[in-house]
Amino acid sequence: MTKQFAVIGNPIEQSRSPELHHAFAEKTGVDLNYQKRLAPLDGFESSMRSFFAEGGSGMNVTVPFKEQAFALCDVLTERAQIAKAVNTLWMENGKLHGDNTDGQGLVAAIQALEWNLENTTILILGAGGATRGVIYPLVQAGTQKIVIANRTLARAEQLVDDLKTAVPQAQLQAISLNDLEGDFDIVINATSASLSGDALQLPEKLQFKYAYEMAYGKPSSFLDQAKQRNVPYSEGFGMLVGQAIEAFYIWNGVRPQLKDFL
């Protein structure tokens, strides 16, 4: 019997999840159908529950519903608890289970680029949900120190406070975006600033070996600056594929190889 999956969000037209999951299915021999599902901004829960009531096997959640999905789950993985957001849902024994595969997607993408994560110092620009979701998997992969830089320093400090007990083995630090300096192995852009006209300037006193932009398919002043410095860089398509692979594995018990889809 064909398993039914969906991605839910608002807007949803831009999602590449159906294309990815159908490609994974073709490669692994899993019989599935994967659809986009547009939910009204005030209608996430009813849309999600009706999908599972109709026999749906699993659902991905995208903006703006990840925090709502987190709040509705009966059972959460450790990384979802730390992220306080869920992008992968499934039903088991009548209970709604939730996970967050975004951070694992980022780790898989960085490893596929053969950038080392062991004992690294990483700078993340931005202190929003995207950053919260990747800290724990980065530390699990061996990152030693993570500095979170945000325009509003208090927000970065709050995030560090929230997360330091979850990742006691790593050093977390908050700084203002106005105080960017020092040497880092990897800089990760988790802000939308480089996608809008509000371009982020990386000062000369900030040095780094690699640059990763979480967004993909759009012009990025962050990556333009990495190119000017001749620093190896990547945009976020690998992270998108990586998080989708992790969700596919949770649902179907088989893990496609990231390199086959980049």
From Swiss-Prot:
Pathway assignment: Metabolic intermediate biosynthesis; chorismate biosynthesis; chorismate from D-erythrose 4-phosphate and phosphoenolpyruvate: step 4/7
Active site: K66 (proton acceptor)
Residue sites binding NADP(+) per the record: E78, G126, A127, G128, G129, A130, N150, R151, T152, L153, A154, R155, M214, G236
GO cellular component assignments: cytosol
Pfam families documented for this protein: SDH_C, Shikimate_DH, Shikimate_dh_N
Catalytic activity line of the entry: shikimate + NADP(+) = 3-dehydroshikimate + NADPH + H(+)
InterPro entries: Aminoacid_DH-like_N_sf (IPR046346), NAD(P)-bd_dom_sf (IPR036291), SDH_C (IPR041121), Shikimate_DH (IPR011342), Shikimate_DH-bd_N (IPR013708), Shikimate_DH_fam (IPR022893), Shikm_DH/Glu-tRNA_Rdtase (IPR006151)
Keywords from the UniProt entry: Amino-acid biosynthesis, Aromatic amino acid biosynthesis, NADP, Oxidoreductase
A GO MF term: shikimate 3-dehydrogenase (NADP+) activity
CDD domains linked to this entry: NAD_bind_Shikimate_DH
EC number: 1.1.1.25
The keyword Protein biosynthesis appears for this protein: no
Annotated shikimate binding sites: S15, R16, S17, T62, N87, D102, Y216
GO biological process: amino acid biosynthetic process; aromatic amino acid family biosynthetic process; chorismate biosynthetic process; shikimate metabolic process
Protein task: Involved in the biosynthesis of the chorismate, which leads to the biosynthesis of aromatic amino acids. Catalyzes the reversible NADPH linked reduction of 3-dehydroshikimate (DHSA) to yield shikimate (SA).
Family according to the record: Belongs to the shikimate dehydrogenase family.
HAMAP family registered for this protein in UniProt: Shikimate_DH_AroE (MF_00222)
Protein known as: Shikimate dehydrogenase (NADP(+))
Species the sequence originates in: Acinetobacter baumannii (strain ATCC 17978 / DSM 105126 / CIP 53.77 / LMG 1025 / NCDC KC755 / 5377)
Encoding gene per record: aroE
